[in-house]
Design a protein with these regions (language model features):
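Short coil/turn segments at secondary-structure boundaries
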Residues: 47-53
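Glycine/serine-rich anion-binding loops at beta->alpha junctions
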Residues: 53-89
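Extended polybasic, low-complexity segments that bind anionic RNA or targeting/receptor surfaces
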Residues: 1-45, 90-205
């Protein structure tokens, strides 16, 4: 069974943790692709809307009589053929979300973490606690760990961390329940506290 170093804030190895093969096996790239597409589809607002001829203001009166004028027959000034007319087949509000099976979602997250580990971009630290919810404290932590783009993962009770990183560019903090494949892949490094990493392993095993 492979092992991963647990580092402290100075970057020194403090302990090691086992990496179960059930989680860190070969990555399934197609499943990762499907999970990312699903995540992004579920994030869409789906509020784009255009007005068809039924909803454009005006156009209730027939512009001229049907026959006898020599002009083309027209029933409404809001025909899509006319200037200021309605839109044909334009977008309408809709729900883009769809369900991906829970097994597939978990397997995709396992694959994403396996790829991060293979690229040496998976980090486990002894703890991510901050004394105060201050941006400068979070920035000091990021600097000490020599990170640039990072996803920090800890338990929900670490409220100071979540508040402190809000103003840091390229850094995001989530709790274990909020961990998703898109955030894992969108950041160069994924940093777990030891307790969060153990919780994720238990969830994915």
């Amino acid at each position: 069974m492979a092992k991963l170093d647990i580092i402290d804030r100075s970057g020194k190895t403090a302990a090691q943790v086992d990496l179960p093969e059930s989680v860190f096996s070969a990555a399934n790239d197609h499943l990762i692709y499907e999970a990312v597409i699903n995540y992004r589809a579920n994030q869409r607002q789906g509020t784009a809307a255009t007005k068809t001829r039924a909803f454009v203001s005006g156009g209730g009166k027939k512009p001229w009589r049907q026959k006898g004028t020599g002009r083309a027959r027209v029933g409404s000034t809001r025909s899509p053929l006319w200037r200021k007319g309605g839109t044909v087949f334009g977008p309408q509000p809709r729900d883009y979300s769809y369900e991906l099976p829970k097994k597939a979602r978990r397997s995709a997250l396992r694959s994403a973490l396996a790829k991060k580990h293979a690229a040496q971009e998976l980090i486990v630290t002894s703890e991510l606690e901050l004394k105060e919810p201050k941006t400068r404290e979070a920035a000091a932590l990021i600097k000490a760990l020599k990170l640039d783009s990072a996803l920090l993962v800890d338990l929900a009770e670490n409220a100071n961390l979540f508040r402190a990183v809000r103003n840091l560019p390229r850094v995001k903090a989530v709790d274990v329940a909020g961990l998703n494949i898109y955030d894992v892949l969108a950041h160069k490094s994924v940093v777990f506290s030891r307790r969060a990493f153990e919780a994720v392993l238990e969830k994915l095993s």
